Amino acid sequence: MDLKMLLIFIAFLLPSVLGFPIQDNYENSTATTESTQVTTEEDIYDSPSPAETDSEDELIFNRILEVNKDSSQYLQEGDIVPRRSRSAINCRNCYWPQSRDGIVRIPYVLDPTYEENHVKGIREAMAEFETLTCINFVKRKTERDYLIIRSADGCWSNYGKVGGGQTISVMKGGCMWKGIIQHELDHALGFLHEHSRSDRDKYVRIMWEYISPADRPDFKKFENSNNLGLPYDYSSVMHYGPHTFTNTTGKATIVPVPDGSVHIGQRLGLSNLDVAKINRLYNCSRCSTIIDAAFGSLKSANYPRNYSDNTNCVWLIRTRSRKISLHFRAFELRTTRGCQGDYVKVYDGSSKYSTVLMDKTCGSQIPTDVVSSSNLMLIEFVTDGADTASGFQATFTSAKIQRRFKIRN
């Protein structure tokens, strides 16, 4: 094979190599996936289009089904504990109460048999809710209604608040993936699977011929579902994969319409529309955007015109197992002592509990480039009620993470 043909062959293979996703597994290591979408603050309702392959995508959802197949817990739709009396849709008391400060605090207790890495993974999954929405998971004191997160026999949850202590099963060894943990927590917040929406027939076709009679109830459509006035989300963390419950190898059970090539389902983490739905259901006024991309840009609202007073916005950048490099192209924030008024802050992770990469920064001097240690970076922009300025504009790129290995004799 001559050099020209070899280069063509490598160019053909390269996209496939780069497109292989790495999942968030808290038994081992942490990573996410990316797409080529570039998202800005104004695109809060635009969810990313996952770039992972069907087989890898379904590996995550099939993990739930595989783990749950031997579960002694009776489940609907693969991972939902059915209610004994109240309707799963028309249940006004199924939502967690909101405090006067606008925060929805949900008490929880963790299984004492969890090891340190399990606890860390569960809390990281919770922290993304707290960063992107007004949902805060807090350790239980004496509250009557709370979550019991334990390693039972499977990955499953109740729908919404049921009263008293309610179990979310996050089994060690099978369910310790960020997307799965967030999926089950989302059920507890009051969300069903995306394909159960009343308007689903406009967006997907259920291929009943490839679904066994015993599994058909798992594809039930709720005619009176509350869709919150938000679009159908193919990339929701609550969406089935295309081959879920298929009885014929290679045949899809859910096909997008009118474009059958649209990618559906993932278990990697909350999408922008997942976040928007939580905030709308719980009447949260949060400014948050998820950017799943290898490169892109972001800017303060109204840039290059002046930003608004009393702003609190975050951008969560997620890439596929790549370090993120953030470069500020323009920077003009009102100067205050210690930057206690308007500021930009950057974290080395997906929440405000993560290590700080760039502490509160204001003024007109462009900050130096910021590089994450992993595939996650959070940018926070806060302003007070005083004077404003033009704000900032930034771009980001990503590079493969270099892993170090110790050689043992």
Swiss-Prot record:
Pfam families: Astacin, CUB. Residues 30-39 have a biased composition (Low complexity). Expressed in ovary and gonads. Residues 87-285 form the Peptidase M12A domain. GO terms for cellular component: cortical granule; cytoplasm; plasma membrane. The active site is at E184. Keywords: Cell membrane, Cytoplasm, Cytoplasmic vesicle, Disulfide bond, Fertilization, Hydrolase, Membrane, Metal-binding, Metalloprotease, Protease, Signal, Zinc, Zymogen. Zn(2+) binds at H183, H187, H193. It is an enzyme of class 3 (hydrolase). Residues 287-399 form the CUB domain. It is found in: Cytoplasm; Cell membrane; Cytoplasmic vesicle, Secretory vesicle, Cortical granule. Residues 30-54 are annotated as: Disordered. SMART domains: CUB, ZnMc. The keyword Hydrolase applies. The keyword Nucleus does not apply. Its main location: cytoplasm. GO terms for biological process: cell adhesion; fertilization; negative regulation of binding of sperm to zona pellucida; positive regulation of protein processing; prevention of polyspermy; proteolysis. Residues 1-19 form the signal peptide. Binds 1 zinc ion per subunit. PANTHER family: ASTACIN-LIKE METALLOENDOPEPTIDASE-RELATED, DISCOIDIN, CUB, EGF, LAMININ , AND ZINC METALLOPROTEASE DOMAIN CONTAINING. This is Astacin-like metalloendopeptidase. The lineage of its organism: Eukaryota, Metazoa, Chordata, Craniata, Vertebrata. The gene is ASTL.
